[in-house]
Amino acid sequence: MRSLRFISAEALVSHSQLVQENLDNIAYNLYPLLFKASYLLEQADVTRALLSHWPLEEFRLAVLLRPNTDHPEDLRDRACKACLEACMQGIADHVLKSGSNRLRVADFTGIQDVQVQQCPCGRALGRWGRTKVLARTCCQLQGQPCSAGHPIEVFADLFVTEGNFDMVVQALKPLGPAPLQVCCPSLRADSLSPGQLLQVLGLAGPGNLRKLEVVHNVRLHAGHVQQLLTQVGFPQLTSLTLPTKAFDAPPTCAPDPEGEDLLLTSIAWELSQMNQLTELSVAFSTLTGKIQTLLSPLKTPLRVLDLANCALNHEDISFLADCNHTAHLEVLDLSGHNLVHLYPSTFFRLLSQAAQTLRVLTLEECNITDSHVNMMILGLSPCSQLQQFKFLGNPLSGSALRRLFAALCELPRLRHIEFPVPKDCYPEGAIYPQDELSVSKFDQQKYDVIAEDLRAVLLRANREDIQVSTPLFGSFDPDIHETSNELGTFLLQAFKTALENFSRALEQME
């Protein structure tokens, strides 16, 4: 329930002109209250004016938007375009306003990007857009005299692609005086060359970087990864994501005569020097028989591990089942591996070791069939902490799903299930794993009936708290959604370049 203070704040910020004319007469401790009220009601003019006059030393957006005694609603999942742009404009006004000398830290981290915006305008400013607005503001202010006499540290989760690379570089490496100093605890990179990636990381302050995501269209091989880790260094890094094929050997690298992967050994040693690293995602890298080489040197147990589609063999699964990381795992993705069919006892030993900590388990396209359901029920039953279970793309019938759902109801903390379209809904003889065209060609009416049956299973078990869904093409990714046009252009250019290279090769052969 909202407090009388907050109701009064809402009434006040609804009169934009009145607030702006009287900001100098408002007590400092009311600014946070008025800010949340203006953000909630999307009074962008008031939001900007509040930041322009901000009388406190710190402005931390996530702290101001989180639940409090005056207003219990959490607004951190509102990446409202109008309000966030107003915040940045207000910071710029603050810098240029004479007499404004208290603000030292502006923290824009902690905003959660979601699929459906609850703000009145319904328009989101995602991580890439926020990066662009911040970089543009920094560039516009460079060279301006700073009335405060000291730069304002602006903390932000940066998302850098080819589309905003030049602007971000200029913001991070100003040529002259800069009233805003960008601090980057988290960085996501996409559609960059290896050289561009190294450049932006060097400027972003890798010594303070906590999370690094290098994804999709950053074409790295093992030589690049080794260079990245040895030359840049990330002593504070807690989370690392590497792109597809990041552990492939460089094209000019001759295989070791004794079969050792010296580059991987070197990379693993560099990772072992990161004493705070607890999250590692290396999906779609070929790591057959190499998991022990990669993970055994790590000194700190991993909490998050993504090994989806890494072509793991029995040796790899055996190592995972017995290594020191497993008892600490909270999030595990082993999608794309035929685990239950090929290595059932080893895989279920792994689940047993992780049972007391595992919160999120993803087993998409693992060829789990009806004949495996009883084993899956036994394997999952000890996982008392499990909150999310995702198993899209597995050829399971409606009856098998009903049995599995009945067992999942027994997991007390489970809140979210992503289940596949039942195989009953596809034509006879459908081949798994399915391509994007095939996966969408199913009998919607049959699916609706089975999905309703599955929800009825939950209701009969008094588990209305469990949300179920079938996202055909995977869970919503706000970063991909926001930059889809740029990624499409990048892929088309890469395809064109490949065709040109192929054509030249044919001409040389002739």
UniProtKB/Swiss-Prot annotation:
Homology family: Belongs to the PRAME family. LRRC14 subfamily.
Protein name: Leucine-rich repeat-containing protein 14B
Xref: InterPro entries: LRR_dom_sf, PRAME_domain
Start and stop residues of the LRR repeats: 100-137, 181-205, 234-273, 274-298, 299-330, 331-349, 355-382, 383-407
Organism annotation: Mus musculus
Keywords, ordered alphabetically: Leucine-rich repeat, Repeat
